[in-house]
Regions:
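Feature captures the catalytic ectodomains and active-site-proximal regions of enzymes
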Residues: 1-504
Length: 504
């Protein structure tokens, strides 16, 4: 009989020196302090080359959970696309070419959508610019850009600079125009807050929104009104740039979770999230990555198959698993943890705890749904039904993104209280080992030494604590978590898992 393990992922919990802006060290965390002092602890790299991203690139939840579940470094789509742009292979992508040629032959417009940022989490500015070059080279006459502003993975007022750069690029190619600009809060929702998506959709499809002649000035006016990039109200710069039936659309976001809802709204005949004032059903709609495996839309960069993930091994061995998170991170402990596979594994139970929808931002409810997630974990441990439990607490990341220090402190303390309850139950079960970690940093830097608010992830390492007294842990990277879990459970490690157990 194998041993049991419970993996607790504290999303956005990085390790950094104590500073006034470090909510992790400023918060009161008696339970984590005890666990980290009583049990072996190490630090894990969660960014850059160690998670399959470009050197120096901050990690993110999708990448982190993919690496954790796979037990190997999984090279990501961001560096792949960037490399193909450099080699010229990007410009030969047949899926992109088909959409471009459809627009050219039909005389219709080509629409390029994407998060306008160099944050590299959901998209990259460089990729959008390369697409504009490609459309120009292939002779498309009408190209319209619908851009979402970031403000989370990059500074909250960096958007005006990105829009200015896009405006300059459009002038350079000559056939492209900025059609709409909006904060990601609207068109890049992932929690089925359809009122938000509807506002974004109506700007892109119906030309409804704040009318402006100059995109940069519209963003700067938003700043003057106290509204930063993420929340910029949908702005219509070029009303004739609305998407119409028969047009071609290329969505340049490569991360699925915040690209799905707008894609559904634009493409599904039976879509019921909101009543569409205008249906467009584009002639060609290209997803840069796979946004939803149930969609039949063309994908420029199809997913690579990751075999023998930690979840696969549990199913293969006939072991029971329990995955739990609130809505904001549910896809991460299921789809991403399973290597981009939506299908539930044999013996894998899942629990989705709804994230609170009644507040527009999580600084207003920093506890989120953590207590309910904690209840489910404690119940699962107490039941002794499961061999592996995987849980995510979203607070330090989601509240960290708001940039509000007081709320981040409450978020960290909420997670600490939950870990106290989970550890108390786990310590009643000697055959179960608790493994505590994070997928990337965030709340460890809420503002810098100059007091400038930081809403982005960090490149700091993350903790790794294993409740095995007397053992020793080496430092490593996220890819080493699954092999360590297998070692704890006394199960063999498959050849595909190139990470290593950090237990010594």
């Amino acid at each position: 009989m194998s041993k049991k393990a419970a993996l607790i992922i504290m999303d956005g919990f990085g390790i950094a020196p104590p500073t006034a802006g470090n909510a992790i060290t400023q918060a009161d965390t008696p339970h984590l302090d005890r666990l980290f002092s009583e049990y072996p602890c190490a630090q894990l790299s969660a960014s850059g080359l160690d998670v399959g991203l470009p050197d120096g690139q901050m990690g993110n939840s999708e990448v982190g959970h993919t690496n954790i579940g796979a037990g190997r470094v999984v090279f990501q789509i961001l560096p792949k696309i960037s490399q193909e742009i450099r080699t010229g292979k990007f410009f030969e992508n047949k899926v992109y070419i088909k959409a471009i040629e459809d627009a050219k032959v039909s005389g219709k417009a080509l629409h390029v959508m994407g998060l306008l940022s160099d944050g590299g989490v959901h998209s990259h500015l460089e990729h959008i610019f390369a697409m504009l070059d490609m459309a120009k080279a292939r002779g498309v006459e009408k190209v319209f850009v619908h851009c979402f502003l970031d403000g989370r993975d990059v500074p909250p007022t960096s958007g005006a600079g990105f829009v200015a750069a896009l405006q300059k690029k459009c002038e350079e190619v000559g056939n492209a125009h900025i059609a709409t600009v909006q904060g990601r809060f609207w068109g890049m929702d992932r929690d089925k807050r359809w009122d938000r998506v509807e506002r974004g959709y109506n700007a892109i499809v119906c030309g409804e929104g704040v009318l402006a002649e100059d995109a940069v000035k519209a963003v700067e006016d938003s700043y003057a009104a106290g509204v930063t990039d993420e929340f910029v109200e949908p702005v219509v710069v070029c009303p004739e740039g609305a998407i119409n039936a028969g047009d071609s659309v290329i969505f340049m976001n490569f991360r699925p979770d915040r690209a799905r809802e707008m894609t559904w709204a634009l493409n599904l005949p039976d879509f019921d999230g909101f009543e569409r004032k205008k249906e467009v059903f584009p002639l060609s709609y290209v997803c840069t990555a796979q946004y939803d495996e149930t969609l039949t839309l063309p994908i420029a960069y199809p997913p690579e198959v990751i075999t023998n993930t930690l979840g696969d091994l549990m199913s293969e061995k006939g072991l029971r698993q329990f995955r739990v998170a609130e809505t904001e991170k549910y896809a991460h402990v299921t789809f991403f943890f399973n290597g981009g596979v939506e299908k539930q594994g044999e013996g894998e139970d899942r629990c989705l705890v709804p994230s609170p929808k009644e507040f527009p931002t999580y600084d207003l409810i920093p506890q989120m749904s953590a207590e309910k997630v904690c209840d489910k974990v404690v119940e699962a441990i107490a039941s002794e039904k499961y061999d592996l439990i995987v849980c995510n607490f979203a607070n330090c990341d989601m509240v960290g993104h708001t940039g509000v220090m007081e709320a981040a402190l409450k978020a960290v303390e909420t997670v600490d209280a939950c870990l106290g309850r989970i550890a108390a139950e786990a310590e009643k079960h000697p055959d179960l080992t608790l493994l505590i970690t994070a997928d990337h940093g965030n709340a460890d830097c809420m503002f810098d030494e100059n007091g400038k608010v930081n809403t982005a992830h960090t490149t700091n390492p993350v903790p790794f604590c294993v409740t095995k007294k007397g053992a020793r842990l080496e430092n490593g990277r996220l890819a080493d978590i699954a092999p360590t879990i297998l070692a704890v459970m006394e199960l063999p490690q498959p050849a595909e898992m190139t990470g290593r157990s950090l237990l010594k």
